[in-house]
Amino acid sequence: MFKRLYENRDIIEIKVWRVEKSSDKPHGFKYSLVFIRDGKRVIGYDNAERKRDHRHYRGKEYQYSFQGIDTLIDDFFNDVRRFKNEG
């Protein structure tokens, strides 16, 4: 688990667990990556129970194609950078 609280009170939290492979987690990982601003999730990547891999961006949910943990983390931080640049 990784959690960082920034001076402006933004929060980034990353959790990854290795789990038994299943129909909703065929890669054998359960994960939750969130970027929180003003107490609200604005970006999130997860595969909650009975939901396949997906991402949340500014209140909308999108399917996510899991390519591995390193790519997952890169994609998450790319979204965080994009969000911060959009203002």
PLM region spans:
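The feature represents the first ordered module of a protein
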Residues: 1-54
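Short, compact, well-ordered microdomains
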Residues: 61-87
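Short helix/strand-capping connector loops at secondary-structure junctions
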Residues: 51-64
